[in-house]
């Protein structure tokens, strides 16, 4: 492995990257938050179903 070649490719990617605008950042946060809420709701739904079944938790 040639470390200089790998480092130069990493530097090239970092130079191309830019910071997101506020709208893009808030949209990413909103989508990530919605995903977290969805997974939590799904877990709660599974827990509720397992509790209602005979011999559940």
Curated annotation (Swiss-Prot):
Membrane topology: Single-pass membrane protein
Cellular component GO terms, alphabetical: plasma membrane
Protein's UniProt keywords contain Ubl conjugation: no
Cysteine disulfide links: none
MF (Gene Ontology): protein transmembrane transporter activity
Compartment annotation: Cell membrane
Classification via HAMAP family: SecE
Subunit structure: Component of the Sec protein translocase complex. Heterotrimer consisting of SecY (alpha), SecG (beta) and SecE (gamma) subunits. The heterotrimers can form oligomers, although 1 heterotrimer is thought to be able to translocate proteins. Interacts with the ribosome. May interact with SecDF, and other proteins may be involved.
Protein name: Protein translocase subunit SecE
């Amino acid at each position: 492995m040639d470390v200089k070649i790998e480092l130069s490719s990493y530097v090239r990617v970092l130079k191309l990257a830019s910071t997101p605008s506020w709208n893009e950042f808030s949209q990413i946060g909103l989508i990530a938050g919605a995903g977290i809420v969805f997974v939590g709701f799904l877990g709660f739904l599974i827990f509720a179903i397992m509790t209602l079944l005979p011999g559940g938790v």
